[in-house]
Amino acid sequence: MQSHPEVAVLRYGHRPGRDDRMTTHVGLTARALGADRVLFPDNATQAAETVRDITGRFGGPFDVERTTELNATIEDWPGVVVHLTMYGEQLQSVDDEIRTTHREEPVLVVVGGEKVPGDVYEAADWNVGVTNQPHSEVAGLAVFLDRLFDGRELEQGYENAERRVIPEELGKHVVDVEDGDHAEGAAAGDGD
């Protein structure tokens, strides 16, 4: 969310073929829930393309980057590093402190994709567990960002969108922004 110091999400690790959907969803969740950018491992080409495409169609601002320097990204981060792991401190015991720190400093949220080395745990300012139970890293990211932004991310607008979803009780309603009266809809339960 552009009114605060930056929030970036680093996907730490990606196994092509196995993690494609999950890595893509890390990026989509970061975008939808207020982060300013996502950094993917260099081999996450398809995930990066998909998130860029969604950002182009549904608006931003949101940046997508790929890097071969995952550890250097963490080590050189100019603010605080939050590593999401089920083994970390309970979110509810540290979220106020992280939120307060974020008022002054950018936050890098590290989301593991495969076994995360101990160096990441040591480099993080906080190792945070959303439930301390096995769960999806996408779910953990969503809950963390909602706590970080205190729900404000749910009201954010998106600039330069080509398409916009019109909320409805039933069905799907998507309009082209240039032609607001042209809607594409489908009955509830059709497709995604």
From Swiss-Prot:
InterPro entries assigned: Alpha/beta_knot_MTases (IPR029028), tRNA_m1G_MTases_N (IPR029026), tRNA_mtfrase_aTrm56 (IPR002845)
Pfam families from the UniProt entry: Trm56
GO CC annotation: cytoplasm
Localization annotation: Cytoplasm
EC number(s) recorded for this UniProt protein: 2.1.1.206
Binding site for S-adenosyl-L-methionine: L84, G112, G113, E114, K115, V116
Family label: Belongs to the aTrm56 family.
Protein name: tRNA (cytidine(56)-2'-O)-methyltransferase
Protein function: Specifically catalyzes the AdoMet-dependent 2'-O-ribose methylation of cytidine at position 56 in tRNAs.
GO biological process: tRNA nucleoside ribose methylation
Top EC group: transferase
UniProt xrefs under NCBIfam families: PRK03958.1
Catalytic activity, reaction form: cytidine(56) in tRNA + S-adenosyl-L-methionine = 2'-O-methylcytidine(56) in tRNA + S-adenosyl-L-homocysteine + H(+)
Keyword S-adenosyl-L-methionine in record: yes
GO molecular function: tRNA (cytidine(56)-2'-O)-methyltransferase activity
Keywords on record: Cytoplasm, Methyltransferase, S-adenosyl-L-methionine, Transferase, tRNA processing
Oligomer status and interactors: Homodimer.
